[in-house]
């Protein structure tokens, strides 16, 4: 079987080679592919084709994908966590250093000089750009995942005192965070004690406008705020008030909107955080591997809307089911198999929210019986999508 993949944006070709020979890359021409691979393409407001089974975002965020719509249609949405983490980490650390010494403004000033006495002008004017060192300053990191954890560790190595806040940090991630990073239980402590604050959390209804009037009201004067996560995490109206009051000395963001441009205390980058050759390659490779594993085996890794499910395929056939998370669904699946006198080699059912995912491995060589079972599932209530995979 050959799977069709539609790509959006410029996906690294080395990453696409991870798909292997069983995949046909149709660029953006296919009208009804099995999978999408994309970066920043906005899919909101679009209808998904009937064959579409998977969407892989070559990046960490999925705000450009209507995840709820995909879930309801039985489409698994993947991301590539950690693939661009080092790139974003370096961008944030560079931003801290740039803001501490005001290098960008200093460069603009120096480029405006002219004449034979430029060296003299430099010596006379450089005092206005005298900054501070970051050693012994306090950095507050909100979100200690793949990116935030790296920033916290390296900021400590640069001599900073580091506070970290993340009530949802995984055990695996926690093991990789330096013991010198002080974990705080209340985000207010980050606001109150930090000279620099950087945020690395997804945009949800709970995190939207994390930096609002109340948050800025807790901060000490002269705080630098760095946002390489999502623009909407900051209430811009409250930000302007904080800038005017001197609470925020500088705001550095990777998400430009017109109202933030040309402000002397705001530095806007054109979404460069994860845009390095290495990061784009890593994201493409991870996206390619993820799509290949899912399409060929049904296994799910790094999905945002379905649980991770991994199980080696040893039986002749595997049926994957995306179903609504309702009582007795596993019993109904088992009964349907039993009614056709088919032996179950292995079954895994895991849920996430209102939906669940089932891997059903069948020790049966009669393909007609397997097809009868597939037809039965496709006509069953609360089962959204059925796939048949042959070993």
Regions of interest found by a model, annotated:
Residues 1-80, 212-214, 218, 235, ...:
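An N-terminal-biased, well-structured beta-alpha scaffold segment characteristic
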Residues 5-7, 141, 321:
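Hydrophobic Val/Ile/Leu positions in short beta-strands of Rossmann-like dinucleotide-binding domains
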Residues 44-46, 168-259, 275:
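Rossmann-like adenosine-cofactor binding region
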Residues 73, 81-138, 302:
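Phosphate-binding beta-alpha-beta segment of Rossmann-like dinucleotide-binding domains, i.e.
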Residues 89-108, 155-160, 286-299, 334-338, ...:
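Oxidoreductase and adenylate-handling cofactor-binding alpha/beta cores
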Residues 144-145:
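Glycine-rich Rossmann-fold phosphate-binding loop(s) that bind the pyrophosphate
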Residues 148-149:
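N-terminal Rossmann-fold NAD(P) dinucleotide-binding loop
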Residues 273-391:
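NAD(P)-dependent dehydrogenase/reductase Rossmann-like domain
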């Amino acid at each position: 079987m050959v799977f069709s993949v539609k790509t959006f944006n410029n996906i690294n070709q080395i990453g696409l080679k991870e798909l292997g020979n069983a995949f046909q890359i149709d660029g953006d021409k296919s009208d009804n592919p099995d999978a999408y691979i994309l970066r920043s393409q906005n899919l909101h407001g679009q209808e998904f084709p009937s064959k579409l089974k998977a969407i892989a975002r070559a990046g960490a965020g999925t705000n450009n994908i209507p995840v709820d719509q995909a879930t309801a249609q039985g489409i698994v949405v993947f991301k590539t966590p950690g693939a661009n983490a080092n790139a974003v980490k370096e961008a944030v650390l560079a931003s801290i250093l740039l803001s501490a010494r005001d290098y960008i403004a200093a460069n603009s000033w120096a480029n405006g000089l002219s004449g034979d006495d430029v060296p003299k002008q430099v010596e006379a004017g450089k005092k206005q750009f005298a900054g501070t060192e970051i050693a012994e300053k306090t950095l507050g990191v909100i979100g200690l995942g793949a990116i935030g954890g790296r920033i916290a560790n390296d900021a400590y190595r640069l001599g900073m005192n580091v506070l970290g806040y993340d009530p949802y940090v995984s055990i695996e991630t926690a093991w990789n965070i330096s013991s010198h990073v002080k974990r705080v239980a209340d985000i207010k402590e980050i606001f109150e004690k930090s000279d620099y604050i950087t945020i690395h959390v997804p945009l949800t209804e709970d995190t939207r406008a994390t930096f609002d009037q109340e948050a800025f009201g807790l901060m000490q004067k002269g705080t630098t705020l760095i946002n390489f996560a999502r623009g909407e995490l900051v209430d811009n109206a409250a930000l302007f008030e904080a800038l005017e009051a001197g609470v925020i000395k500088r705001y550095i963001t990777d998400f430009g909107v017109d109202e933030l441009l040309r402000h002397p205390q705001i530095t806007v980058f054109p979404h460069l955080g994860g845009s390095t050759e290495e990061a784009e390659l890593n994201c493409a490779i991870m996206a390619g591997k993820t799509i290949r594993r899912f399409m060929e085996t049904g296994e799910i890794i790094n999905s945002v809307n379905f649980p991770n499910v991994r199980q080696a395929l040893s039986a002749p056939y595997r049926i994957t089911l995306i179903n609504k998370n309702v009582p007795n669904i596993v019993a109904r699946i088992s009964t349907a198999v039993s009614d056709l006198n088919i032996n179950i080699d292995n079954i895994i059912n895991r849920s996430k929210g209102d939906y669940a995912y089932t891997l059903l491995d069948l020790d049966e060589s009669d393909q007609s019986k397997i097809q009868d079972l597939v037809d039965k599932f496709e006509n069953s209530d609360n089962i959204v999508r059925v796939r048949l995979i042959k070993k």
